[in-house]
Amino acid sequence: MSNNKIIESLAILYLNNYINDNDIYSLSLINREFHINIIKDDYFYSTINKNYLFLYIKIFKLLSIKVKLNPNWINIINNNNNINNNNNNNNNNNNNNNNNNNNKIKLIKNNFSVISERLNFLIQCKFNLHRYLDNNDLFITILRGEKLSTLDRIICFSIIYSQDQILLFLLNFILSNINCNNNNNNNNNNNNNNNNNNISNISNSNRLLANNSYNIQFNQQIPTQNELINLNKCLQFSTSTTTTTTTTMVPPFNENILKVYPIYFAIVKVIGGGSLVRFLLSILPNVYNITNVNCKLPITNRSALFYSTTREMTLLLLQLGCNIHDMDYKGMLPIHYHSLNGHVDVVKCLIDDSTINALDQSNNTPLNLASLSGNLSLAKILLNSGARLSIDNLNGRYPIHNACVNGNIDLIRYFLELYSKMNSTTLLPSTTTTTTTTTTTMTTTTTTAITTTTATTIQNNSNNLTNSNSSSVGGLRISNGGNTQQQSIQIPDKENNTPIDLLVLNNHFTIAIELLKYEGYIVGKEEFNFKTARKIGAGAFGDVYLVEWRNKNVAVKRVKIEKILESGKSYQWIRDKFILEAVLMVKLSNFSSFVKLYATCIEEKELLLVLEFCDNGSLYTILNTIPIGGAGANNNNNNNNNNDIIQSLPSINTLSLNIANGMNYLHSLKPQIIHRDLTSQNILIDRNGIAKIADFGISRFKNDIGDKTMTSIGNPRFRSPEVTKGQKYSEKVDVFGFGMILYEMFTRRVPFHDYEQIAASFKIANAERPPLPQTIDHRWSNLIQICWDQNPNNRPSFDQILTIIQNLPIANIPKFLVPLQQNQNQIQNQNQNQNQNNGKLDLSTSSSSITNLNNAVTAKLSLSTSGGLFSGDSDYTVGTCSGYDIGYDNDGDIIDYSSDQNDSDLYD
């Protein structure tokens, strides 16, 4: 015999009280396999639960059968009571009759005790009924935590699990109690006639479907009303002693204790639901009146129409008087609910002019919700019926946004086709040039936006593409592609997430390529000739080339696919990580604090990023190509160009503001973007001296769970101590890197320049910091020290840093190496900040706002998603080469690819 059979046998013995809990426990200790099956796998208790359910059904059947076999129990019991009351007076005269009655009573009581015993057992194990219901998804969805009586629960159970016999038994029992209660209020002589007339009226006048199967079963298979009344009184009698002088009265049964939930489960039933609904309405019209406002679910306020899942049921409910404009607790109409759940046939029945573009409390239309469910056929039906694409919800999301959350590629392609027709079949609205400049947020360079002044429509779709005058849209922008009439769908929502951002945030990478194509960012590899291109940067898994493309110089980042495949990664993994970085660069391309992405190539054997070429190279190159010595040292020709660049650069204030402004924007996004490799190698300087943040190859967004642990990525010299220690990290790792960049700009040295990189990272992890020159103003020193504080919680945010820098004195990058000598006060101040981990920067002198920033520094950003190319779960990075100046090989050593004397000051 298998273990499962043995366990089932034990369960039966347990149910019949042959063994108890101690026996089961002892057996589990003796036999390890029993321990696994009984305790660990819970098979024993699940078997008991299953047997309880079968027993539940069996007892109900037994009750019904017993009542049928003993229809005159109540008369015999009452006679027995009368005999007991008059026993002393009539003992001699009725001795023989009394003996006969006593025998009958004894037999009846024996039979009744069996029923009573099983009923008590049924009540004791009713928690198993609750367990079955509470684990049922449909029951949980409709109930929403509402408390139900056991009677309501049994009715719901009978409907959900199609236990028709139990359901009919219960309904007859309910009717018997209701009419029994009515009889107590009427004349006893007319009680039975009135009762029968009432039931006849309920069954005939209000019955919606005659001779259906439920009514036939109801009348034929279940005990009569008198039998049920007798059963009820017998149950009550069992609680009395045999010497009771009068039979205990049955407590009045009030139908108001019943709730509306059972009929909702009948409505949801796909097979036989219509007949069951009609039956319930005919039997208990006062309880299950679906047109009554009290019939709405108490918590969700949803009417019966919300839970219809078929066309037939929907038409039945509409015929019965259900209102299509009934709102639930979220302000949703039934059409909203069914659009969200993809019930196409139901939505067809609910569409009219008043519902097609109706808004719920979140300003979602049925089309918004259908797009979120990714139902293409439903979206087409709604659009052909007059639904509009141009209505956004309170989160600023249009149907295209929700479609990208779902990731249905066919639906997204359909929307893209509609957007393209918007401009190819109609006149474009007039355009206005707008420029926005603020003091605390970054502003875009002057861009052209389409401002809608009148509604435009597509003739083929019945006004379904009417542009909205909502200010949240700001007009749909022209796409980046070659077709200037192509309508861009890079529309940010209230959290600055565009449709393509939502795709990558929900891991729909393949579909993201479709949107990149639509926006004109995808190009073919045949446009680039790497044989004639000059390599200007390299790393372990990627190279950067200077290429002439479409009549301009660009930097092309080329991923070494074969090299990465050798490390064990799949092409899909490589491509997905690459798309993350490309999408991030697309969003940052309009803003001066970030390197612009012109195009990308995503093919099986080629992954390319076509980037803006920054003439002055990286900040690292500028700071580290210097003459060795102090002021007045002889400058050779190798450094003349570099000195010219340094002299032409803006102050450290402006450069640091530019960097901090961009990082502040990244950290303010939802989800938050963490660069994770903020070093001077990844800060590029264009010909105008504007600092641009580059290389988002290992950036990542912070999810809702919280801080993440991070593998040792990036340059060890700029790596925060929590990263080196493998601890949880936050956006404060970028603040640490920013502090190291400030140190490098003031000293023209990398942190711990006289140590190997790994040794430098260990010194940082041990709370050591490179010495600060005494020539640095103490206010700048304080900022650097608080940024690289050992405790991440003590580091300021970039928003605070922006305010601080506005109040610092002007400082410039020195022409030569600065002696690293410190006075005693600076050492003590630094030790206090690093070792006590309680340093707090004094912001009392900071101004309340930042004003009159350089236009190159204040650029308004519109990024909403992260990069993440070869992110923290990988053991390598392409990152350091995308600054296309120098890279790090596998050992982290600097690789010099300079071959042209004139370019040595630009790309090392």
Swiss-Prot record:
It comes from the Eukaryota. ATP binds at residues 536-544, 557. Residues 1-153 are extracellular. Residues 175-908 are cytoplasmic. Keywords: ANK repeat, ATP-binding, Kinase, Membrane, Nucleotide-binding, Repeat, Serine/threonine-protein kinase, Transferase, Transmembrane, Transmembrane helix. The keyword Kinase applies. The active site is at residue 677. It is found in: Membrane. The chain crosses the membrane at residues 154-174. One of its GO terms (molecular function) is protein serine kinase activity. It holds the Pfam family PK_Tyr_Ser-Thr. ANK repeats lie at residues 258-289, 300-326, 330-361, 362-391, 395-424, 495-524. Residues 461-472 have a biased composition (Low complexity). SUPFAM superfamilies: Ankyrin repeat, Protein kinase-like (PK-like). Its EC number is 2.7.11.1. Residues 530-817 form the Protein kinase domain. Residues 480-490 have a biased composition (Polar residues). GO terms for biological process: signal transduction. It is an enzyme of class 2 (transferase). Gene3D superfamilies: Ankyrin repeat-containing domain, Transferase(Phosphotransferase) domain 1. Residues 461-491 are annotated as: Disordered. It is a single-pass type I membrane protein. Belongs to the protein kinase superfamily. TKL Ser/Thr protein kinase family. This is Probable serine/threonine-protein kinase DDB_G0278521. It comes from Dictyostelium discoideum.
